Amino acid sequence: MTQVDYTRAAKYFLLQDFWVGMKLGMKYFFAPKATLNYPHEKGPLSPRFRGEHALRRYPNGEERCIACKLCEAVCPAQAITIDAEPRDDGSRRTTRYDIDMTKCIYCGFCEEACPVDAIVEGPNFEFSTETREELYYDKDRLLANGERWEAEIARNLEMDAPYR
């Protein structure tokens, strides 16, 4: 005669595994949500976030870039192209500053190499395009990005200053 395992039969007939699963499901059903409804809700960004590139200006309106070409030299993807000419006062300024965003790997080396904080990676990460040509940024577009995001860029650089 075989011995019957009553605990195993009780678990089977009382649907214990089912109720354990239902309890777990109800626990997560009423718990706070871990995800955001992205297009309508946005999460916080770190001050060190590396998004869309921008060229900055001084408060008097003059461009910060001194055409040292350190960012071009340090770029591992070779995404930056700079041409410069001397000005009447003897300083150099860029005549061409292009970034090929299809090559850029968002490493931040250009931002770290810049001695005057001219090139920065701003807080904007929503810059999808319909054509590849729109991802070739010229100097005018980079300066426009800098003007658009200057307040937030300056605040982020100030918050990051103790760690530089």
Swiss-Prot record:
Record GO cellular component, one term: plasma membrane
Residues engaged in binding [4Fe-4S] cluster 2: C75, C104, C107, C110
Enzyme Commission code(s) on record: 7.1.1.-
Residues where [4Fe-4S] cluster 1 binds: C65, C68, C71, C114
A GO molecular-function annotation: 4 iron, 4 sulfur cluster binding
Keyword Cell inner membrane among UniProt keywords: yes
Membrane topology: Peripheral membrane protein
Protein family per UniProt: Belongs to the complex I 23 kDa subunit family.
Binding partners and assembly: NDH-1 is composed of 14 different subunits. Subunits NuoA, H, J, K, L, M, N constitute the membrane sector of the complex.
Name of the protein in question: NADH-quinone oxidoreductase subunit I
Organism: Roseobacter denitrificans (strain ATCC 33942 / OCh 114) (Erythrobacter sp. (strain OCh 114))
